[in-house]
A protein has these predicted regions:
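Non-catalytic DNA-binding core/recognition domains of DNA-processing enzymes
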Residues: 60, 81-84
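Basic, low-complexity segments
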Residues: 1-50
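Alpha-helical support elements that line or immediately flank enzyme active sites
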Residues: 60-72
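A ubiquitous short alpha-helical element
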Residues: 47-51, 506-509
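Anion-binding and metal-coordination hotspots
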Residues: 74-82, 96-99, 107-579
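Short, positively charged loop/turn segments that connect secondary-structure elements
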Residues: 87-105
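Short alpha-helix boundary/capping elements
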Residues: 37, 69-72, 86, 90
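Short helix-capping and inter-helix turn/linker motifs at the boundaries of alpha-helical repeat units
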Residues: 54-57
């Protein structure tokens, strides 16, 4: 068991306490600090030994971390505020002579929280206390949303990524110090601290850039050849990670062989049926290596933070970093879930995990989940519907003003004894389908209209030639219209039927009106308490920052609710003390 420090002064009222506004977070934290955080919750962080110096109480460190995120300050500034800020001393119960603790204590404590998986202890404790105090109902409606977090690492171009990956792999292989002389002069250059980070060449010259790329790609492959391959299982995790990182950079950002044909903009060229497109001269021979045209899926952006990704809010705005998802209970305005995910991951992917798995620890199961269209996909509706949770969200419309979309076809799943049928806007009905695979490799039905009927249809120009490649093929006969159903087509049809008429759309807007509360909560997290900018490298540490910031926001809200009346204050204190 940890040994508590005995040199800390007793928590007695200080003469400057009257100067602090009673409605401030500092004053409220001073009232509830003894029941808000307990040392017993963090016993697994310490060894059961009498050796070593007496430990700083973990409750004191956690409360200091809450104040740190409240004031959005660094570890060094938090150390200074522990010494000089009377508001912090009053909130933590420290005397004027107490100098607090060193900034490194905060760093070591965060690392131990992640190692033992205790970063959510206080967050779940506050949510459980709010539920036991009657501030949150188990089945209360909740609203979910997400926002972006800028990564702490810088984004690097391909040249810098390759140089950084080579340097990292050489270091983990042990080619430093005395062993650096065993490397060829070309590879030893990457470890020479006297050499510039960026080579001195004319970056405006395409030939010079191409030559430099060929050199560093050859160096990268030479360094990868230094990794033992006889027994891959015997490689240390650090070496395997660095080698995989460098190999991925080469695969994602560099291509070789004949260059691909240039992409045409707009619709493909139309050629008469039975003819071939005219021959085009082949591009000039350039076998590379050269920079890849386009962006590889899940491309790396940084060597120091390999999990950093580009996220897209729209077609015009993107950011390098991560995405934070939150869930908020509408009545109490308390957060029930905080989670950090990759920036390039769709919002619907973690929706079921956020609502079901995370909230199982706090005993909540909302009857309704309000969200925007990103969370309202058919897959999410089906998965949460099986758990008795209704998703209230708009379905994103299929916009194609020049052609008929899938919404304008009448789909009857129960027709023909379950075989189903699809009717087009011209009144033609088909039940002919074949089985296909969707993007998740699930079996779906693909209904096909007869080629001859579509060729003679008056609406052919509005039906064929749309964005899905329904164009005349230069050799094959022009196909008829095809309509692919969703894997959860019944759920999708039910959701669209509930928001079709103006009255239904108006009713849906009224149900979604409380969703604006989560925007204020996101603004509080991101702008007031600094979550917009990531402090640490990696998704796990960024998630730690998000969870601690969410814990602070919940503590502020819970103590504000407790200050409303004596009954709520007593219920909150009893719930915290019993938890």
């Amino acid at each position: 068991m940890m040994r508590r420090r005995v040199d800390l002064p007793p928590a007695e009222p200080q003469p400057w306490a009257a100067l602090i506004p009673p409605e401030s977070f500092y004053a409220r934290l001073a009232v509830y600090r003894e029941v808000l955080v307990t040392d017993e919750d963090y016993v697994p962080l310490y060894k059961d030994s009498g050796r070593g110096r007496p430990s700083i109480p973990p409750s004191l460190v956690v409360l200091a971390m809450l104040l740190q995120y409240h004031d959005d300050c660094s570890d060094v500034e938090a150390e200074q505020r522990l010494r000089f800020d009377l508001r912090w001393k009053h909130a933590l119960g420290l005397g004027l002579e107490d100098v607090g603790f060193d900034a490194t204590v905060l760093c070591h404590f965060r690392r131990k929280l992640l190692d033992r998986g205790l970063e959510r202890v206080l967050f779940e404790r506050l949510v459980n206390a709010a539920r036991e105090a009657g501030l949150i109902a188990r089945t209360a409606a909740q609203v979910v949303d997400s926002s972006h977090v800028l990564g702490a690492a810088g984004v690097r171009d391909t040249y810098a990524l390759l140089r950084g990956g080579i340097r990292k792999l050489l270091r983990v292989l042990g080619y430093t110090g005395d062993r650096q002389g065993a490397l060829p002069e070309r590879l030893a250059w990457y470890l020479d601290p006297t050499q510039p980070e960026k080579p001195d060449l004319d970056w405006t010259d395409p030939a010079a850039r191409a030559q430099h790329l060929r050199e560093i790609v050859a160096d990268a492959r030479a360094v990868l050849a230094l990794v033992p391959t006889e027994d891959p299982a015997s490689l240390s995790p650090v070496v395997a990670e660095a080698a995989g990182l460098l190999a991925k950079i080469v695969a994602d950002d560099v291509e070789e062989g004949p260059p691909p044909a240039p992409k045409r903009r707009g619709r493909p060229r139309q050629h008469p049926v039975g003819t071939l497109p005219p021959d085009e001269p082949p591009p000039a021979a350039d076998l590379g290596p050269r920079l890849r045209q386009g962006v590889a899926p899940d491309r790396l952006l940084s060597v120091v933070d390999p999990e950093l990704r580009w996220g897209h809010k729209s077609s015009h705005y993107r950011w390098p970093g991560y995405k934070v998802h939150i869930a908020e209970e509408l009545t109490s305005e308390l957060l029930t879930t905080v989670a950090t995910r990759p920036a390039n991951e769709h919002d619907a992917v973690p929706a079921v995990e956020l609502v079901c798995e995370h909230q199982a620890h706090v005993g909540l199961r909302p009857a309704e989940l309000l969200s925007d269209g990103a969370y309202g996909t058919a897959d999410v509706r089906a998965a949460l519907g099986e758990r008795g949770i209704e998703v209230v969200a708009r379905l994103r419309p299929l916009t194609d003003p020049k052609h008929f979309s899938k919404e304008e076809f009448t789909i009857d799943l129960a027709a023909q004894d379950g075989r189903g049928s699809v009717s087009c806007p011209a009144g033609i009905t088909t039940n002919d389908y074949r089985m296909a695979r969707d993007t998740q490799n699930r079996p779906v039905r693909l209904y096909r209209f007869p080629r001859q009927v579509c060729a003679a249809c008056a609406l052919r120009q509005r039906c064929l030639g749309g964005p899905c490649g329904r164009v005349a093929h230069p050799v094959r006969q022009p196909p008829g219209r095809q309509v692919q159903l969703h894997f959860h087509e019944a759920v999708l049809q039910q959701a669209r039927a509930a928001q079709r008429t103006p009255e239904q759309k108006r009713a849906l807007r009224e149900r979604l009106r409380p969703r604006a509360k989560v925007e204020r909560k996101l603004a509080e997290l991101m702008r007031r308490h600094g979550l917009r900018q990531g402090r640490y490298l990696g998704r796990l540490k960024t998630d730690l920052q998000a969870v601690l910031t969410g814990t602070l926001v919940n503590a502020k809200r819970l103590l504000a609710l407790a200050a409303r009346d004596a009954y709520t204050a007593r219920a909150v204190r009893q719930a915290l003390a019993s938890g």
